[in-house]
Design a protein with these regions (language model features):
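Catalytic cores of DNA base-excision repair glycosylases
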Residues: 13, 19-220, 224-233
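Short, basic, low-complexity termini and linkers enriched in Ser/Thr/Gly/Pro
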Residues: 8, 238-240
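Small/flexible residues
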Residues: 98, 155-156, 238, 245, ...
Length: 260
């Protein structure tokens, strides 16, 4: 289940970070077709499966064509396997397409073509893991739930702990941190994509994908610069990092005095 114990670390700047990221998100978020309430829950799930290990910019045309051809679970469930593989195109890992079709068949037959609305039911669907179930709960249904992927782990670790996240699967401490800093939702926010927890999940993920990247982070463009626990600096020449000429794995990480 998506549940963790609370971390031991005292977090003092979570509200300030959330406010800064929300402002940045509303001004700078990429206008992807499944965002801002424009896609069905099924469409959101399709986008999440397609985006696994694939850049979102590559996903958009495939998602548009896919949803026009198979707009719901019933349509995909009835499709020929060869057509499904062909439509997946160059997204990579075609097994994902077949698992998505298996998922569609379960949704069509067991849930009357409506995506289930609980985390446990989503997790039980073919090909759906913790991240995808949590993402659908947040992005499609507006539920307050911590979403944890590689980008979110990296951002939260850098911003709140002043260190890099470890590789591999998310640790219990990382999941606990994600749960601890998740904003409370405002009952007055009726639209699911406006709820603070949803904006938080999407903005942290977006920051990790576009600014707080793994190897060449754009610290000077970070909306939480001055709040975050550390930035990445080159001992002598920051410009080479900004131009992508220096691998951050070979750069000294500096905890910025006065930020935390």
């Amino acid at each position: 289940m998506n549940d963790t114990n609370e971390p031991n670390t005292e977090i003092e700047n979570a509200e300030a970070v959330a406010d800064a990221l929300a402002e940045w998100w509303h001004a700078s978020a990429r206008d992807l077709p499944w965002r801002f309430g424009r896609a069905t829950p099924w469409g959101v799930l399709v986008s999440e499966v397609m985006s696994q290990q694939t850049q979102m910019s590559r996903v958009v045309p495939y998602w548009n064509d896919w949803m026009e051809r198979w707009p719901d679970a019933v349509a995909l469930a009835d499709a020929a396997k060869a057509d499904v593989i062909t439509a997946w195109g160059r997204l990579g890992y075609p097994r994902r397409a077949l698992r998505l079709q298996e998922c569609a068949r379960v949704v069509a037959s067991d849930y009357d073509n409506k995506l289930p609305r609980t985390y446990d039911e989503l997790l039980a669907l073919p090909g759906i893991g913790d991240y995808t179930a949590s993402a659908v709960m947040s992005f499609a249904f507006g539920e307050r739930i911590a979403v944890v992927d590689t980008n979110i782990r990296r951002v939260l670790s850098r911003v709140f702990l002043g260190k890099e996240s470890l590789g591999g699967a998310a640790s219990p401490a990382e999941r606990a941190l994600a749960k601890q800093v998740l904003p409370q939702d405002d009952a007055s926010k009726c639209r699911r994509f406006d709820r603070p927890s949803v904006v938080w999940n999407q903005s942290v993920m977006e920051l990790g994908a576009t600014v707080c990247t793994a190897k060449v982070p754009l610290c000077e463009a970070c909306p939480v610069l001055g709040i975050a626990c550390f930035c990445i600096m080159v001992v002598r020449d920051w410009g080479n990092v900004a131009r992508g000429r220096v691998n951050v794995s070979k750069v000294r990480i500096v905890r910025c005095v006065g930020w935390c």
